[in-house]
Amino acid sequence: MLNEQDYKLLAAKGITEQQLNQQLADLRAGFPFLELSAAASLDNGGIYAPTPEVRKAYLRAWQDYVADVDHKVVKFVPASGAASRMFKDLFTFLDGTSETPDTDFMKSFFEHLPQAAFLHDLDQKLQELHGKTSEQLVAEGDYKSVVAALLGTRGLNYGHLPKALLKFHRYEGDTSRTPFEEHLVEGALYAKNAEGKVQLHFTVSPEHRSLFETLSATASQQLGAQYQAQYDISFSEQKSSTDTIAANADGTPFRNADGSLLFRPGGHGALIENLNDIDADIIFVKTVDNVSPDRLKEDTVTNKQLLAGLLVSLQAQAFAYLEELEEGNVSEERMQEILHFLEKDLHCQSDTAHGLEGLELLDYLYTRLNRPIRVCGMVRNVGEPGGGPFMVYNADGSISLQILESSQIDMNDPAKKRLFEEGTHFNPVDLVCGVRDFNGEKFHLPDFVDPSTGFISHKSKDGKELLALELPGLWNGAMSDWNTVFVEVPLSTFNPVKTVNDLFRPQHQV
């Protein structure tokens, strides 16, 4: 089935033949739906809403934690995502026959264009290209030249850049910030240590890395002075060893016109490898486009500190218990206390655990506690697309908290569909991760991935249909075997930009 060229390609990518065969088997068999127990909610205890007093305690816990310079905190931002989908309607207008805006979306775009953070740059470019501003061109009815200058390679090239590098927010004095810069500001506000050091890591695509590095050099100096921060910014790219094989409808490998195997990027789940490479104690994870201007940052900062304070508090308790368990001389009464912590605070529920005693119970407690831990913010469901928080049955019959996408749930089962639709909260991708064990050693994060939680989608290449394989999502199956806690955070912390017109919402205006 494989030829000499195939083996060379596999070797170059760092993919074994065994991995290739497993991917093809997954594409043929598909992935099972997950077995739901319930949608996590405030009512059933799956989502936690701390009282004001408890919130204060967690905020203090985080301040104490970052005050210790031996603690290494990193803010991790997946930033390779292209902005092209943001401008889908603009591309359609540009390619269409109408010379004037003929949809509500395009009318709204031109109505609000004067508020855009990128207007200054756009007008400069239009002056170069046409000797006129956007206002003048619009007055003349030349809408398409404005859109072409925003999206095209002769203009600002926004249609082909990553979202992280687009100007999102306009500030006084004609200054503006990209999401990249807003994440630097956020980092200074909640991830700065006692020496003023702020560490951020961005995953980027190879073709845009130099643009990130250029912006990083100037932004880290300017914002470092403004926020008394010493930035340490690093970048990585998705590893080619995480690419996945494409398949024909019959499950055989898809080949390009030249006969070579077609591999595709494995989706954001591939970034568990990048996350694993980071040398840190605590890692904040957040999507690149969920940023707010300064006037709205307070909620975000406070709630990030809250999540982190809860995490280090839970972790400290888990570590203390693990030290006792490792020594081995633990009474049955003490083990029942630890089991209660595991079930009530870390939401690991298992009927069989209650039938264990002695060494069997000790071993169970040790194994379950000695895992990476994540605390995830969850916002009230307001109909936004995306995954949600659920209580899910594991293969051993135990129940744990998981973030699921709709494709992981059997929507043909009315009961399951109802659970999904009645979910009170959804996942804004707002995580704090503890990635070291109680001995200070880093966990090997790929060991905690559930390989049976990938995704299959239908795509096409050169006019031919293909099956594409996505690895278990970074905050879905890639963190399936972590200890997980869900906490309610306000909707004000969730301001994603999915279309260019989202930038004109009040949440993105200064």
Where are these regions (language model features)?
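Conserved catalytic alpha/beta cores of large enzymes that bind or transform nucleotide phosphates
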Residues: 130-141, 158, 289, 294, ...
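C-terminal, active-site-flanking charged/polar segments
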Residues: 283, 393-428, 437, 453-458
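Long, compositionally biased intrinsically disordered regions
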Residues: 2-42, 192, 217, 356, ...
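Intrinsically disordered, low-complexity boundary segments flanking structured domains
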Residues: 219-224, 391, 412-421, 469-476
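Domain-scale recognition of functional cores that engage charged ligands
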Residues: 10, 14, 39-382, 386, ...
